[in-house]
Amino acid sequence: MIPEKIRAEDGGDPERTEMKIAIGNDHTAVELKHIIVDLLEEKGHTVLNLGTDTEESCDYPVYGERVGRAVASGQADLGIAICGTGLGISLAANKVQGVRACVCSEPYTAVMSRRHNDANVLCFGARVVGSEMAKMIVEQWLDAEFEGGRHQRRVDLIMEIERRECGEE
C-alpha cells in the first residue's frame, strides 16, 4: 500500500509529502516522458528515470520490468510506464510480484485505478494520448487515494492469486 502521500480530492493538502516516482519508456515515448518528468519535478517529486532517452528502437518489456522492480522493491513509491499504447509495458510491469499496473487513457480510469485497485504503476500510450491529456492523467492519478474497505478485500484477493502463481501458497 502507498504511504499517506497522496493529495486529497478536495484540491490538495499543503503538507503533502513528495514522492519518488520511477518512470520508464520505450523509443515511442521519449518526448512524452520528458514532459511528464518536468511535470513531476515541478510538483516537487523526485524522479527515477529508468527509460530510454533515444528514439532508437528498443524493447518495452525491459522498461516495464525496471519500473515494476523499482516500485516492488521500495526504491520508488509509484511508477509510470509509457510505450506506444501502454499495453505491452503494463503487461511487463505486471509480471513483477507486488505490482498493480493499470493502463489509463483518460483521467477517470486513472482515478479509479488508485481508488479501487490501489494501482502502483500507471501506464499509458504515447500514440494514444497527447501531452496535455497525459499530464491530466498523471495529476489525477497522483491526487487519488485508495479507498480501502471492500476494495482492500478485492486487492487482497488479487494478491492472493499472485502469491499462488508465484508458488508462495
Describe each model-derived feature in a short phrase:
Residues A22-G24, T28-A29, P107-E169:
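C-terminal binding/interaction regions
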Residues D38, E65, R69, L91, ...:
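Alpha-helical segments flanking ligand/cofactor-binding loops in enzyme cores
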Residues A22-E42:
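Glycine-rich phosphate/diphosphate-binding loop of Rossmann-like nucleotide-binding domains
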Residues T46-S57:
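A short beta-strand-loop structural module common to alpha/beta enzyme folds
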Residues Y63-V103:
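Helix-adjacent hinge/juxtasegments
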Residues K5-E18:
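Short, Lys/Arg-enriched N-terminal segments with co-localized hydrophobic residues
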